[in-house]
């Protein structure tokens, strides 16, 4: 049997003619929100457009959607997915008097209050916090972070229902509208703010393909989002963002009801000790891999490329190790939203991911997934797992999967084949959200169904082979493995074949 260590000793660091299978998500901002730049991002490797609803108006986000769709008219390529990232429930400070920044020294004692009369009258003596229950959930000795941890305070005393006495642990400035984090404290904020609900309805109206749901703490939070999306948004994938200790603690229950996961390391690294973040990342990714649910690694992956043309070596290692951990997708934030080198950042991420994919010991990974997956599995999963085994044994160059809902490609992707998964579907939405699954190359087959099922199957397989040749996946003489159904309808994927192109 192939060993992990043996695999690494023979590792090639050349990209060669291999095709990257890890998807890349790009946050779109002022530097990239035009059709021409979006085309260049797609050519560089972008698969999913991310809109950050913590910033921008509906008019602006509408322009991102319109420009993304315009880019597909200018350059066909692979289908492009669009993701809506919610602002989520959060805690913020109030407005300082005259919007002035107030410097404070270390060991400075002051008051945090939920009294609304201070909402626009904060200073270096009293700071308003918009979380009414803060005095009920926190206790003396706890730490409060302000402005992503730039300022740290220790709670000295809970004075009454509205008031905390705190002491600064470092020097800094009191500013308006800064985020507040309560590490180690269970908060009871609602899953969705009114703004979030309005944003989700905007997403449904505009046909987004997935929602990145911020600050998810419980499984019920996911169900609440699904309820707001309603019947019209039933096909929108919900990707939970794990950003706090509660989300980590409740992860197993959350994983059962979500469509996928984002390990959002920014806020997570404030809510839990920073040295623990890498271990939590590995643990959550492993659980997602075993469950067959897509997982995204995000935040500060190539942060220095916001302003520099080359990444730090640590950043490149971070991207590569996220791929090795098992991430289906990696994400860029400020690098493509406001950065000076957005195209170069995507190219760097794409090349790094491609090399990292060659470092994965595929057969031992497959064996782990097969051995740890509870039995019996569904018929579709059994066929999916068998197809990946067939790829290894036949040294096939690709899998071609006929799918209606995208579920079979998801299950094939779970078992980490070392070749592309060519997905042929008549469902454009399924084609787009399938970018969440590592290795899936989706293509939309828009011909009408043939009355003879077997004829229709062969036409779609031939279409998949044709597209795979166009994209450099296959050449004549290659061996392929195909998955199809024995009859029309959802859930009938039960036939595996080995063919020669």
Swiss-Prot record:
It holds the Pfam family PK. It comes from the Eukaryota. The keyword Transferase applies. It is an enzyme of class 2 (transferase). Its EC number is 2.7.1.40. SUPFAM superfamilies: Phosphoenolpyruvate/pyruvate domain (SSF51621), PK beta-barrel domain-like (SSF50800), PK C-terminal domain-like (SSF52935). Coiled coil: none annotated. InterPro entries: Pyr_Knase, Pyrv/PenolPyrv_kinase-like_dom, Pyrv_kinase-like_dom_sf, Pyrv_Knase-like_insert_dom_sf, Pyrv_Knase_AS, Pyrv_Knase_brl, Pyrv_Knase_C, Pyrv_Knase_C_sf. Homotetramer. This is Pyruvate kinase. It comes from Kluyveromyces lactis (strain ATCC 8585 / CBS 2359 / DSM 70799 / NBRC 1267 / NRRL Y-1140 / WM37) (Yeast). The gene is PYK1.
